[in-house]
Amino acid sequence: MDAEVILIDEGITETPLDLDADLIGISAITGTAPRSYSLADHFRSRGIPVVLGGVHPTLVPQEAAEHADSIVVGYAEQTWPQLLRDFVGGAMRERYDQDPNLSLADLPFPRRDLLPSRHYVTMNTVEATRGCIHSCRFCVVPSAWGRPLQRPVGDVVADIKQMRMRRLIFLDLNLIADVDYAKELFTELATLKLKWGGLTTTMIAWDDELLDLAARSGCRGLLLGFESLSRGSLAETRKSFNMRTDYYDVVRRLHERGISIMGCFVFGFDGDTPDVFEQTVDFVMDVNIDLPRYAILTPFPSTPLFRQLENEGRILTRDWSLYDGQHVVHEPMQMSPEWLLSGTEWAWKRTYEHRSIAKRLLCSRIQMPTLYAANLGYRFYANNLSTFYNCDWVVRRERAAA
C-alpha cells in the first residue's frame, strides 16, 4: 500500500487542528481519553474519518465508539493493516478486534525514524514480550490485553542489532514472566555486550541463575513494583507473590550484582492509614532504593478494582483526565482524599531532599551518572507537582460540597 505516514506524539507537540489527512488514527490511554475524544470530534466535524485504539478504547469500546468512525480493540498488528485495506476499498468496519491467535513472530521493526529523536531522552527501546501472568486488581493489563505474548528471541536480537545501539530499555511489563524464555533472552543479550534496563517483579530474586544471567547480559537497572509494605494490601490487590518476598533481600541481591532499582509504591489501599507515607519513606531510605516512585491507587475502568469501588459508591469522578496515578479519584477507606493527596506529595518531597538523594545513592554503592541525573529530575518533579498536573481538584470538590 502506498501511503504517507505522519506520526505525532502529543507528549512533545500538539496536533495541528488544520491537519490534512485521509484517515487519522488516535491511540489513547485513560488519562488522555478526553483530549483524544476532543481531537476525534474535531477532525470528524471536518469530514476526516477517525479511528480510535489503544488501552482506553480497548477497556471501554462502547464509549470510544461514540467518538470514532471505527475502533481497534486490543493489539493492532493484524487488525490495523486489515482496516487500512478495508478503508481503501471503501468498506471500513465500525470495529476491529484482536485476533485471539495473534503471534508476534516476524513482525516489521518499529518505525522509530518517524519520531524526532531530539525530543526524547532515548529512542533505544525494544519489546520482547507483552502482557503479564499475574492478575493484580488495579492493573489494566489482564483486562485489556489478555494472555501474555512473546517475540521469538531471534527477532528481538535482530531488532537490537539493526538499531546499532549499546544501551537500551526493555518496555516489557514483566520481562521474566516466562523464566525459561527470559534465560534464553539474557543468554543471547550477553553476546551483544549491551547495557540495558527493564521492568520485572520481585520474583527475579527467587532464582539466582536468572539473576546472574541478567547481570551478565548487561542489566544495569530494573523497575520493581513493591507496591506496599503491608501484607494485607498485597493480598487485597492479588499480589501475593510479593508476600513471599523479603524486600530487604531483593534489594541486597540486586545491588550486589550492580543492578540499580526503581522501586514503585502505591498509596490508597483500603488498609492504608495516615502513617503509611512515613513508613514507606523510612523503608525506602533504609534499604537505599536508587530511584523511588510513588503513585496514588487508581481504579482504571473495567478493572476488578474499578468494579468494586463502583459497587461501593466510592468512585469520586469519571473525569478520565484525572486517572493518571497522581490524583485521588476514589474515596479511601481510612483517610480523606485530601490526606491521601497531601501525604503522597509529602513522600515525594521528603524522598527527594538533597540529603535523601545523597544517602540513598552513596549507600547503594551503584555509581552511575544517569542515576544522579534521574534523581535530580524527580527532585524537580517532587517540588513542582502542581505545575505537572492539576492537583487542586479535590480542594475544589470539597468546596463544592460545602
Which ranges hold each PLM region?
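Alpha-helical structural signal in soluble globular domains
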Residues: 1, 42, 46, 63, ...
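Acidic, low-complexity intrinsically disordered segments
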Residues: 1-167
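Radical SAM enzyme core and accessory elements
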Residues: 2-7, 22, 116-118, 304-306, ...
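Structured beta->alpha junctions
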Residues: 28, 32, 56, 72, ...
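Structural detector of well-ordered beta-strand residues that form the stable sheet scaffold
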Residues: 51, 72, 95-96, 197-199, ...
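Flexible glycine/acidic-rich beta-alpha junction loops that bind and position SAM and/or redox cofactors
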Residues: 63, 179-180, 232-237, 267-275, ...
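Structural recognition of alpha->loop->beta junctions
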Residues: 63-81, 213-223, 279-294
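Radical SAM [4Fe-4S] cluster-binding motif and immediate context
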Residues: 109-262, 267-269, 273-274, 278-282
